[in-house]
């Protein structure tokens, strides 16, 4: 609806400003030891690695699914005659799902590996979609968005952790 247009435009402007600031940042040169002085590979060579592609695709998928569902849910809830306070509660459960697992997702990755945790995230995101399509009562929205948060955490944290293994110290910041 048009009543939310101003909010989305404001968020777009803030996002563009943030991107502009980030593009202007230059990370400091990494501190290297004599073991890290190997010549850096060209960026296209780094990007063509299958592991790199899996990591980037996983992180982008997690982010895309999360943003789409998180922004659409309050609109769907209002459309189905839920109070805005109920939509806020659903988003609170979602945010808990996104960040609470961070206390242990790193340990799970260390124990089971990146790919199993990423696949678990994909499974949770799939469960989110199935629950979202199953009904419009409050319980469906809460459980779907909570699963979305945990699925995002597992897939995004797993993917970005996987990404850190695709380059050397000399190749950071490219």
Identify the role of each PLM range.
Residues 12-33:
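C-terminal membrane-cytosol helix-exit motif in multi-pass small-molecule transporters
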Residues 27-56:
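Juxtamembrane intracellular "pre-TM" segments in multi-pass secondary transporters
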Residues 48-69, 146:
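Pair of pore-lining "gating" transmembrane helices in MFS-fold secondary transporters
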Residues 71-90:
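Short amphipathic helix-loop junctions that connect adjacent transmembrane helices
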Residues 100-114:
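Helix-to-loop junctions at the C-terminal end of transmembrane segments
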Residues 116-131:
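Structural signature of the two symmetry-related core transmembrane helices
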Residues 133-144:
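Helix-loop junctions at membrane interfaces in 12-TM secondary transporters
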Residues 154-167:
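Intracellular juxtamembrane helix-capping segments at the cytosolic ends
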């Amino acid at each position: 609806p048009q009543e939310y247009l101003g909010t989305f435009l404001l968020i777009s402007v803030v996002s563009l400003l943030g991107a502009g600031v980030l593009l202007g940042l230059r990370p400091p040169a990494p501190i290297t030891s004599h073991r890290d002085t190997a010549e850096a590979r060209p960026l296209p060579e780094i990007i063509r690695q299958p592991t790199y592609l899996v990591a980037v695709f996983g992180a982008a998928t997690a982010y895309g699914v999360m943003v789409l569902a998180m922004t659409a849910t309050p609109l769907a809830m209002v459309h189905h005659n839920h109070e805005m306070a109920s939509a806020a509660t659903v988003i609170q459960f979602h945010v808990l799902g996104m960040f609470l697992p961070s206390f242990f997702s790193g340990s799970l990755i260390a124990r089971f590996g990146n790919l199993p945790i990423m696949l678990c995230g994909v499974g949770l995101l799939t469960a989110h979609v199935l629950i979202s399509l199953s009904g419009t009562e409050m319980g469906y929205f809460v459980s779907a968005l909570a699963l979305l948060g945990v699925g995002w955490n597992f897939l995004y944290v797993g993917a970005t952790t996987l990404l850190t293994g695709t380059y050397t110290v000399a190749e950071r910041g490219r």
